[in-house]
Design a protein with these regions (language model features):
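Acidic, low-complexity/disordered tracts enriched in E/D and polar residues
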Residues: 1-40
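Long, charge-rich, low-complexity alpha-helical segments
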Residues: 30-88
């Protein structure tokens, strides 16, 4: 998988949002907000092609989290990104 080009992560106060930076990507009816963990995963995903296993490893390396819990969170995050249309 990979992120769709044109979506940028922005921090507003204590929250993170994904912003479509071209008119084709802007949907004024939907804002994609991310928590700190999902923002970390997005930054990892932006580095290139990724899968659940690679994001899980990055999450475990960065945070003190059990691999099983990390994989559950990563899969849920990827599913939400697919639903939002920000990855392919």
């Amino acid at each position: 998988m990979k992120t769709i080009e044109g979506f940028k992560l922005r921090k507003l106060g204590n929250e993170y949002i994904l912003v479509g930076e071209s008119m084709a990507l802007i949907n004024f009816n939907k804002m994609i907000t991310l928590n700190e963990t999902a923002a970390f995963l997005w930054k990892e995903a932006e580095k290139g092609s990724f899968d659940a296993a690679s994001l899980c490893k990055a999450l475990c390396d960065e945070y003190d989290v059990a691999p099983e819990k990390a994989m559950t969170d990563v899969v849920a995050t990827i599913d939400s990104w697919k639903e939002a249309g920000v990855i392919e």
